[in-house]
């Protein structure tokens, strides 16, 4: 197992208003990332945005078909506005189609515009997110029960009666789940409870603060009697523009 791995983000959006990345760009980018030896390739998620933005799950399906080794996943997918039941089905399918190469980064997102467009109250996002995580865990059936096991779930925001998600993901018991958090105590406790790892962002954290938050997170895991040895972290960094021509970069 590698001590550190490197992933790269698929160029989901265009840099001209109204335009998105083309099919040819997406496919060539994914194949080049695999050729160069990157460990993972990820997509993120917006429904409405100021520029063209490709759909996350559809894009994963496309790159799964043109790659063979590289892991593919989300960083992050908004399971609140998308609905966790639909996400569980779609992500199970991606894991099967990619022969078990999927990792799942989940969060409620921070774009109020996405919530408004989808008719979901923005102020409820964190409570809905915790319930949505419980629904996905249950639908992916980590208790070793038969695939025919029906699920009942009675939450404040999500209610299921006799539900079933078949087929289950390719990976057993399921794809790894990374939970996004800016690093608040409540957020880190949510990561510790529901995640296989923490997906942090370089937007708002320094290396020193990252280590402090990581130590806190491991302590929360221990308090919950959860494994810390296999618990992972990831850091999403800022993108940059590189060219020999200074004017082009600017």
Which ranges hold each PLM region?
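Conserved, mostly hydrophobic/aromatic
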Residues: 33, 37, 45, 63, ...
